[in-house]
Structure formats: structure tokens, C-alpha cells
């Protein structure tokens, strides 16, 4: 009965206690041996020290055995035992418990278990979704922090240049609409051209400008204006007009170079 209740035998418990005590005893003997070996008498009388330690160990073992024999007897008689007169009065566990259940109660219990399982599945799915959202939010937060770190220098611009940020922002917002309408009108008014054709035209005009800028310095601003206009509008009509002007200018330069 005791073994079934305690899940170990009483003798094994007593043996464990005695073994722990013997281990402490041997540690104490080793400590005494180490202390004597560090004294000045260790080299003069090593044999006497060894004999004294042996007698000390035997004495301790005999004392432990004598007292723990009494401990074993007392434990088995008074702790791990019960009086014989109590045998007829021990109540069996669960003897008066009613485990009967009706069909309605069984069905209600099954229904409750099913509902709890469905709720658990929903909660677990919600938990997975929330974890995924949290992971994405953390990634976005990290990315935003990197971008903020890159543009952190903008916070010092108003202080260094004494710019009134609210008024400047309002002005930029007002001009943004006008700029969008202007770009839209330019795109609608300009015919679509290939970028390669425009690049070739620009290269040709730049070479013509280099040839004409040296002998005719007063035309420098004129051709610079037309080149910047061509690069900004990319209009074939403007390119053709400038091309005609260059041809006429080349003819004029040819006439002036003749003697």
C-alpha cells in the first residue's frame, strides 16, 4: 500500500539519506587531510597524519552507522507504517462518487466540445493572421526608418537657411497644380517623337553651335536659348526650324569666309 501511494519503497528512501550523509562525511575527511598537508608538520610526520586521518574516518563511520541504524528503525516503525487497527477504516477513493450521465448530458457535452474546438480553430487562424501582419508591419517600419535616416538632413535645412517651412510648403502646393497643367498642355501640344531622333538632332545642333559660336560671339545667347528650348520641349517642329537656321547660318559664314 505504501509503495503504491509513495511510488518508492521506504528502504530506498532511507538508503538515499544514509548515502548522502556518507558523502558529506568523506568530503569532511578530505578537507581535514588537505588542511593537515599544508601545515609544517606534514613533512616531518606524514605517517602519523595518515594514521590519525584513518582513525578519524573510522570513528565518523561508526558514529553515522550507529545513529542511522536507529533512524532506520524509527522511520520504518513510526513514519512509513500505520497501526493495524486502521485497516478496516480506510475509505476507498471515489467509492461514493456518482459517475452516471444521461444521454442528453452526453449530447450537450459533445456539442460544447465541438463549439469549443471551432472557436479554438478560429482563434488560431486569427493568431496566425495577426502574426503575419505584425511581421509585415515590422518590415515596413524598418524600411521607413531607413528612408527617414536618409532624409534626416532635411530637418536642418530650415534652420541653416532660415526658411519658413509652413509658408514655403503652402507656396509649393499652390504651384504644383499650375505646374501639372502646364506639363499637360506641353505634352498635348507637342507631337510624339522618338528619343533617338531627338538625340540625333540635339547632337547635330550642338556641333553646329560649336562651329558658329567662335566667329559669331553675339549669336551665342541666341543658339543657347534654342538648344535649351529644344531639350525641354522635344518638338520636331522646333528642331526643323533650328535646323533651317543653322543651314542659313552656315551659308552666311561661308560667304563671309570667302576673300
From Swiss-Prot:
Modified residues (Phosphoserine): 190, 213
Keyword Phosphoprotein: yes
InterPro entries in the cross-refs: Centromere_Mis12
Keywords: Cell cycle, Cell division, Centromere, Chromosome, Coiled coil, Kinetochore, Meiosis, Mitosis, Phosphoprotein
Entry superkingdom: Eukaryota
CC annotations in GO: chromosome, centromeric core domain; condensed chromosome, centromeric region; inner kinetochore; kinetochore; MIS12/MIND type complex; nucleus; outer kinetochore
Pfam families recorded: Mis12 (PF05859)
Subcellular location field: Chromosome, Centromere; Chromosome, Centromere, Kinetochore
Keyword set includes Heme: no
Modified residues (Phosphothreonine): 192
BP GO annotations: attachment of mitotic spindle microtubules to kinetochore; cell division; kinetochore assembly; mitotic sister chromatid segregation; spindle attachment to meiosis I kinetochore
Coiled-coil annotated residue ranges, if any: 123-156
PANTHER family linked to this entry: PROTEIN MIS12 HOMOLOG
Family the UniProt entry places it in: Belongs to the mis12 family.
Record's subunit section: Component of the NMS super complex which consists of mis12, mis13, mis14, ndc80, nnf1, nuf2, sos7, spc7, spc24 and spc25. Interacts with dis1, mal2, mis14, ppe1 and ekc1.
Function: Acts as a component of the NMS (Ndc80-MIND-Spc7) super complex which has a role in kinetochore function during late meiotic prophase and throughout the mitotic cell cycle. Required for correct segregation of chromosomes and for maintaining the inner centromere structure.
Protein name: Centromere protein mis12
Organism of this sequence: Schizosaccharomyces pombe (strain 972 / ATCC 24843) (Fission yeast)
Chain's gene name: mis12
Amino acid at each position: 500500500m505504501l509503495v503504491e501511494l509513495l511510488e518508492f519503497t521506504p528502504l530506498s528512501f532511507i538508503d538515499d539519506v544514509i548515502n548522502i550523509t556518507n558523502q558529506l562525511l568523506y568530503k569532511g575527511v578530505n578537507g581535514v587531510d588537505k588542511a593537515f598537508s599544508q601545515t609544517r608538520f606534514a613533512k616531518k610526520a606524514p605517517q602519523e597524519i595518515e594514521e590519525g586521518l584513518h582513525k578519524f574516518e573510522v570513528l565518523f563511520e561508526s558514529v553515522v552507522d550507529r545513529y542511522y541504524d536507529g533512524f532506520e528503525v524509527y522511520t520504518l516503525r513510526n513514519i512509513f507504517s500505520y497501526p493495524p487497527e486502521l485497516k478496516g477504516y480506510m475509505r476507498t477513493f471515489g467509492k461514493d462518487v456518482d459517475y452516471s450521465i444521461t444521454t442528453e448530458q452526453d449530447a450537450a457535452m459533445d456539442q460544447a466540445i465541438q463549439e469549443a474546438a471551432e472557436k479554438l480553430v478560429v482563434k488560431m487562424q486569427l493568431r496566425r493572421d495577426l502574426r503575419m501582419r505584425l511581421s509585415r508591419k515590422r518590415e515596413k517600419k524598418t524600411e521607413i526608418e531607413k528612408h527617414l535616416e536618409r532624409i534626416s538632413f532635411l530637418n536642418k535645412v530650415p534652420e541653416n537657411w532660415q526658411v519658413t517651412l509652413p509658408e514655403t510648403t503652402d507656396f509649393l502646393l499652390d504651384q504644383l497644380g499650375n505646374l501639372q497643367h502646364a506639363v499637360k498642355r506641353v505634352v498635348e501640344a507637342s507631337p510624339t517623337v522618338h528619343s533617338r531622333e531627338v538625340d540625333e538632332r540635339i547632337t547635330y545642333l550642338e556641333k553646329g553651335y560649336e562651329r558658329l559660336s567662335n566667329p559669331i560671339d553675339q549669336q551665342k545667347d541666341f543658339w543657347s536659348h534654342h538648344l535649351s528650348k529644344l531639350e525641354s520641349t522635344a518638338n520636331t517642329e522646333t528642331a526643323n526650324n533650328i535646323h533651317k537656321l543653322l543651314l542659313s547660318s552656315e551659308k552666311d559664314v561661308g560667304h563671309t569666309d570667302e576673300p
